[in-house]
Amino acid sequence: MSTSIPDVAVHDSPAIAAPLRWVGMDGIVVPVQLTIADGGQHVIGRARAQIDLPAMEVKGIHMSRLYRLLDTHAVEPLTPVGICGLLSAMVNSHADCASTAARVDWYFDWLRRVPALVSNDLSGWRGYPVWLRAEYSAGHVQFWLCVEVGYSSTCPCSAALARQMLADAFLQEHVEVSALSPETVADWLRSNGSYATPHSQRSLARIEVALTEQAVELGLPALVDCAERILSTPVQAAVRRVDEQAFARLNGANLMYVEDATRRLQHGLAIHYSAFRVHVRHLESLHPHDAVASTADE
C-alpha cells in the first residue's frame, strides 16, 4: 500500500492550458476585529480570497494555503496596514503558480448603538452592512470601503399634491367664512391635516470610498456620520412618540427624489473623500419597482 498522498493540483496538467484572472474561495466564515474610536468590536463576517493563476501549465492553486493565511490574519484588527501584509503573503505563497496579484473581500455588519432623536435616556442598535475590498496588483494595493446607510425619503411631488388637496379641502369647507381665528384653523388642521398624505419609503444609500494603504483604521463612524448628516433622515432604532414626531419633522424638511439624495451625497462626500461611488435606491411605496441613481468621483 502506498503511503504517499496524491496531489493532483501539483502533479497533473490541465486539460486546457489557459491563464485565469482570479481563483480562490468565497463565503469563508471569519471573525472580524474592528478598531473603532469608541472601542473595539468583534463581529462575524464572510470573506472571499483570490489570487491570479497566470501559469497555464498549473492545474490548480493551493486553496488551503490561502485559508490558513486568512485564518492567521483574523486574530488581528482589520486595517489597511495589516491587510497589505496578508495580500503580499498570499502572492508569495503561490510562487509555484507564478501568481502576481491577490484580493480579499470582507462582508459583515457593523453594529452601532444610536441615541433617539429627542429622548435623552433612550438608544438602540443599528446594523450597517459593510463590504471591504483590498486588491494587490503590480506592486500597488487598492482599498475600497463600502457601507449601506438606511434612511427615509418623502416624495416632493406627492407632498405638493397632498398640500394642494388639503388647501382645496379647507377652502371648500370654509368658502362662506370671511374670517377664522387661529384656534379654529388649528382645530381644523388637527382633524383634517391628514386628508391627503405624501408617500414615503425606506431608502438605501450604498457608499464606497477609497482608503489609503497607510490608514490605521477603516473610518466607519466618520463615513456613516457623514452620510447620515447629509441625508438628514436616517432610520431610527428605539423611539418614543416625541422621537417619532421629530422624525416626521425631519422628513417634511427634507423631501427627496432619488436624484436629490444622490446629488446631496455627491456634493457632501466630495468635501471629505477624494474618490467615492454612490448608489441610491428608493424602495417605492407608490410603485412595485424601485427608483435608483448612482454617481462617482474617482
UniProtKB/Swiss-Prot annotation:
UniProt-recorded Gene Ontology molecular function terms: GTP cyclohydrolase I activity
EC assignment: 3.5.4.16
UniProt GO BP: tetrahydrofolate biosynthetic process
Q: What class of enzyme is it?
A: hydrolase
Known function? Converts GTP to 7,8-dihydroneopterin triphosphate.
- This protein's name: GTP cyclohydrolase FolE2
Q: Which PANTHER family match?
A: GTP CYCLOHYDROLASE MPTA
